[in-house]
Amino acid sequence: MNNSVYGVAFRSLSTGDEKLYKEATRFYHSLGFQTVKLYDNFKNHDDSNLIVGTSKNSVKECWLESFKLSELDSQGFRVPQQEASNQLQTDGVMIKLRLVDTEPLNQTADTVVYYTVSLDEVSKIGERVDDHNVKLVDPLGNVVLVTDSHDGKELNASEFIAPKDSSVEQKITVELVDKDSKKKKIAVMTSGGDSQGMNAAVRAVVRSSIYYGCDVYAVYEGYEGLVKGGDYLRKMEWKDVRGWLSEGGTLIGTARSKEFRERWGRKQACSNLIDQGIDALVVIGGDGSLTGADLFRSEWPSLVEELVKDGKFTEDEVALYQNLTIVGMVGSIDNDMSGTDSTIGAYSALERICEMVDYIDATAKSHSRAFVVEVMGRHCGWLGLMSGIATAADYIFIPERAAPHGKWQDELKRVCQRHREKGRRNNTVIVAEGALDDQLNPITAEQVKDVLVELGLDTKITTLGHVQRGGTAVAHDRWLATLQGVDAVKAILNMTPETPSPLIGILENKVIRMPLVESVKLTKQVAAAIEAKDFDKAISLRDTEFIELYSNFMSTTVNDDGSQLLPEADRLNIAIVHVGAPSAALNAATRAATLYCLAHGHRPYAITNGFSGLIQTGQVKELSWIDVEDWHNLGGSEIGTNRSVAAEDMGTIAYHFQKNKFDGVIILGGFEGFKSLKQLRDGRDQYPIFNIPMCLIPATVSNNVPGTEYSLGSDTCLNALVKYTDAIKQSASSTRRRVFVVEVQGGHSGYVASFTGLVTGAVSVYTPENAINLKTIQEDLALLKESFKHEQGETRNGKLVIRNEMASDVYTTELLADIITEQSNDRFGVRTAIPGHVQQGGVPSSKDRVIASRFAVKCVKFIEQWNKKNTAADNEDFKILRFNYVNGVKQYTVLDEDLSAAVICVNGSKISFKPIAHIWENETNIELRKGQEIHWEEYNEIGDILSGRSMLRRKIQKEQQEESSLPSVADTPLSSVTVSTSAAKEDSALYV
């Protein structure tokens, strides 16, 4: 039953949707409520002034209060009640809006009634019920009734308020009570096989734990150390993980433990943790390690009970340790965990494989040889599949898609022979160590070699082995491990005993939390399905990206024998053009699109030297299989590119499109490509040939294409910068007390600078989004001095400052270095480093190659689908024009034609085609050549926490506060102090 509730002085409303949270804030502002407090758990968790009254599971809170009947001064500001001339006070209405990380309980069904003396104003945004009442529904679904009467009688302002009672002094005393006086203690461990990026994960857990006010311990030697205890459980300090970002393997060790598999071993581990006061554990490992961790958690209460019975502890001593909090992170080069796109170390291992196979290709071509390359992957073929795509292998053997018993030999021969006949000089076959046929017989590298020898090929075997685990982590794995490590600590602090153990994963570009038990269970089902010979189920349990890429590989490589040719009427002419500055993976994407087109009967055309080449020469080249066969690992652009855009001569471009009868266009490029797509789309009214489907694959090192969070070439750029800055940092550390100011590219987009700063542990990052001024430089100087003051000439103490090339017209890289040098008073030295066009990279990274292949095939399918939507009669002119005239009226033969000019975009966990018209109007900053959304701002915040800048600033602020007795300010990132102020005003403006 819905009741009307009067006189509500305080109300708390919750939502798990950030969009609804903002809409609700705007709604109550429109009713006259004013924001009196904003709280963000990520930024303000340790601010004693802001944390008072906030709820434990709030991600954000906005406190709103109504002061509609208060006296205002000449500026329109509310006069404090004690200073008001009328000595009247309002009843006061407070609303607390909360953004929570779990789905909130249903809100009350009751209608809350508020009084107003401005009912006419309220009626403009609500529904008039009668002369005295207006009904509204807030974005969270709560019904609000606003009235100017009581019992049918209209009230005036004086009747809403009461005389101030001077004999009663309202006093609110808020005390901060630490309900649990002990510090939260978190342990972190690595277990199972090592993988690149584990050290970055440990570093993130250690430093974010310290930042959030926790004690943190490292468990050395995995579960073995957990059982042994003592020196194997070591408290970690900030400096202990300095320099770990660039280290391979795991510096805290890993080992498989037979003892932990026994209950007595787990009981001993429980005892060791309680001895140290630890009740939270971050486990970085594979499915076996994570299964053991969850079993440990489920047994924990009974283990504690047994320890009390054994007399090891008293009831009082274990009172605070009744539950163990477990958070899992997947560290595995196999990438075999269900529910997550990639695991820590997988892309680094893939990069090693690609490097080795690229080297092998050179000698194989020289001698016209075949190579069989064995890669890791006992129950998972991710490395086998991705390396097959990235290295242009002729054939792959993976466990999820077993080869047909007794038949795979002939198919392998046919594929390799066909590719030789097309002009290929070498053959590469990738064999996962867990490869088998559909009768569960293992397929070994030796067996594959014997088949190729029968074909008459000089064949060699290369088993890569533990090379795949070696080396430092690539940029992707450092980024993944860092973000997941911080999120693991935040998960621990937000968890209750009832919360299921989470597993930190990633979907496309978004870090997610999944139920650990369910993820491990799904992972083990893959091996069970293979054992049961249910290979369709096995591959279906992999993520959609895996299935999609496997299908693409088969289409472009194994089944390029004419079996997939479409009917003549469905075969298309598809143009491919590169626009803008060169970036890695342009050739890899062109290769994948070409091979997919050829396998289906389409004719791919390369527009050479960009749109200016088409305008000036009209040169178009039809691409063949042998033209693109070895483009998978070539940087730059084989068909030529420049910064010319379509608008230079639309008429000539339309002529050549019509002349070559193009049915679709794939543009690869950065902002120039983006602009060209918009120009072609806008030219449709004048040039009907542009009605063909057109799509853009974002490809630029700057990653500044609006609408998407990923561009081809940006990963290669970041890997180049990681190698460069690692070398620079080593030099800075060797010299002791040295700072390098490194200038990176990116135009007006700070993505490259922010990402580089995060994965290299930079002290400061200057980006165009956060303006540089003297104040920020002074604060950075104070931080550098403070940082070096505590260092006693240890190793790994070199510092990096990352500056985007467009961060400031005044404060250039050289000027920044000069200012820091001048103010350092010889406490430390400063040098500059500008990598320049080295950032474009040479050989494209494995990640860029794989994503290039995926995007390219998606774009060809996009063009196919839009051509199928053409309902024109079998008339060539109508088919090309995509419209005809019926009784003098122009009628389009393709519905929603505007959607056929689109950009392939990655947003969070989603890949989609976004119409260029929508992105241009809603998501583009045309003047600054980038998107409006700064999706990488979190990198700066996390980077500041892990580099120590946030903690040092907090310390300096505290000292200043003690000296001046001023209240502390919110903890905001240093390099965005001035912008944070304006950003706060801007944020408020959204709600007011």
Swiss-Prot record:
SUPFAM superfamilies in alphabetical order: Phosphofructokinase (SSF53784)
Residues binding beta-D-fructose 2,6-bisphosphate 1: 643, 700-704, 745-747, 805, 837-840, 929
Main localization of the protein described in the UniProt heading: cytoplasm
Molecular function in Gene Ontology: 6-phosphofructokinase activity; AMP binding; ATP binding; fructose-6-phosphate binding; identical protein binding; metal ion binding; monosaccharide binding
Catalytic activity: beta-D-fructose 6-phosphate + ATP = beta-D-fructose 1,6-bisphosphate + ADP + H(+)
InterPro entries xrefs: 6-Pfructokinase_euk, ATP_PFK, Pfk_N, PFK_vert-type, Phosphofructokinase_CS, Phosphofructokinase_dom, PKF_sf
Top-level taxon of the source organism: Eukaryota
Subunit: Heterooctamer of 4 alpha and 4 beta chains.
Gene that produces this protein: PFK1
Chain sites annotated for binding Mg(2+): 287
Keyword Oxidoreductase in annotation: no
Species this chain originates from: Kluyveromyces lactis (strain ATCC 8585 / CBS 2359 / DSM 70799 / NBRC 1267 / NRRL Y-1140 / WM37) (Yeast)
Ranges for region Interdomain linker: 559-572
Sequence segments annotated as region (N-terminal catalytic PFK domain 1): 1-558
Record keywords, A-Z: Allosteric enzyme, ATP-binding, Cytoplasm, Glycolysis, Kinase, Magnesium, Metal-binding, Nucleotide-binding, Transferase
GO BP, one annotated term: fructose 1,6-bisphosphate metabolic process
EC number assigned by the record: 2.7.1.11
PANTHER family registered for this protein in UniProt: ATP-DEPENDENT 6-PHOSPHOFRUCTOKINASE SUBUNIT ALPHA, PHOSPHOFRUCTOKINASE
Protein family according to the UniProt entry: Belongs to the phosphofructokinase type A (PFKA) family. ATP-dependent PFK group I subfamily. Eukaryotic two domain clade 'E' sub-subfamily.
Protein known as: ATP-dependent 6-phosphofructokinase subunit alpha
